[in-house]
């Protein structure tokens, strides 16, 4: 039976869940995740304890609980449950208060209550920009891009662009490299004025073939030999044009995005 893990928060639970995933991924074990957001009253805290205790009885073992409850009374209630309770605020915020000699705001959901901030507006603008400039569908205002991802079709450009926009407020356009570009041996004309903003994504040809077969099975587009040709040509073009690039084959979107941010030296971070 899988161990049960509860994500308990007085807000959306995004912070607690992200932290939990980071910790749990260190173990070669599957878990059953139960999300309990908006636990923002004592009544809900008591109901949370009941659910945790029921899971412990059902599983025959203590549950694991990750919490970001800032209300101390609610937190104390949850800590009385039959579980290993990992309290992010107690473990991290309180030591920081002592070190900084400064009291934290203890504002519920503060990290995500940014709907009226400039940071939020920046991210929304970046998302709209990335959607408008996905897969080369528009060349307008490309000069406003922070980065322009290039690579063959299905190499990971779109999800990476959107992640950069949503997480970091980066205006990320993406543009496909197609067989016609390889025949000419040149970058698409729309990209040449923005060479300093280009970053390339490549991928293992066999993996590319598998991905394309899910979309268009049995087609030339997905054939292994065609994928090898496109990847070889794309990488040769990027080397020739002096474009920095990486292989997305064994990297998560988070890893790809972090590498891109380091390479383009764009120190933009969302909190």
Curated annotation (Swiss-Prot):
Keywords: Kinase, Nucleotide-binding, Serine/threonine-protein kinase, Transferase
Keyword Kinase tagged: yes
Residues that, per the record, bind ADP: 151-158
UniProt cross-references to InterPro entries, sorted A to Z: Kinase-pyrophosphorylase, PSRP
MF annotations from Gene Ontology: ADP binding; ATP binding; phosphotransferase activity, phosphate group as acceptor; protein serine/threonine kinase activity
EC number: 2.7.11.33, 2.7.4.28
Enzyme class: transferase
Pfam family, one: Kinase-PPPase
Reaction catalysed by this enzyme: [pyruvate, water dikinase] + ADP = [pyruvate, water dikinase]-phosphate + AMP + H(+); [pyruvate, water dikinase]-phosphate + phosphate + H(+) = [pyruvate, water dikinase] + diphosphate
Family label: Belongs to the pyruvate, phosphate/water dikinase regulatory protein family. PSRP subfamily.
Role played: Bifunctional serine/threonine kinase and phosphorylase involved in the regulation of the phosphoenolpyruvate synthase (PEPS) by catalyzing its phosphorylation/dephosphorylation.
Protein name: Putative phosphoenolpyruvate synthase regulatory protein
Organism: Burkholderia ambifaria (strain MC40-6)
